[in-house]
Each structure stands twice: as C-alpha cells, then as structure tokens.
Amino acid sequence: RSKRFQNYDQKGWSFLSPEAATYLKDFGIEHLLIDTPSVDPEKDQGDLLAHKAFWQWPEHPRKKATITEFIYVPDEVVDGPYLLDLQMAAIVNDATFSRPLLYALEVL
C-alpha cells in the first residue's frame, strides 16, 4: 500500500526520543522534516519532549529552527544533495503551514 494512504490513527507511529532530537540540534540541523504525524508519540499527555529538546525550549529557544511534520516524499526522489526551499504561510502562531520544495543539486 502506498505511503500516501497510510492511516496513522491509533497506530503508534515512529517518533524521536528527546535525546535523538537533541542530537539533531547538536549536529546543526535547523530545519527538521519528518514523514510522520509528529516527532513526539501520539499519547504523551502534551509533554512534547522531542519538540522542546529540538527547540531547546524553554531554556534557550531556537526561534529560527523549524519542524515540518507529515511530509510526503515520493519514492522517485533518490537520496542525495538537495536545496531546500521551505515556504511558510505568513501566520503569526506557534504553528503554520509549510511547503517544502526540493531542488536536486549536481555534485561537481
């Protein structure tokens, strides 16, 4: 079955541990794109520990870091270097719609 039609309702999707989110932050990742409904588990009582770890909230908030969840990448997109054009709606909120566009780069 195509990943475009995956039903995540009550399935317990894959998610990041707070330690994994911290690792990505320490590695220098500014814009995290993930193909699951959330970086946190479905039932976490609103703790959002992976979100908070990635953003270093509330100690040292990384206000320019972003998390884009539930992305869809077609199987035809092969691994390699890409330029990311992360377009976001001009909504002042803690969450907004985004439209990530990938442009393949040629390694010379």
Regions found by a protein language model. Name each.
Residues 1-108:
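Active-/binding-site microenvironments in catalytic and ligand-binding cores
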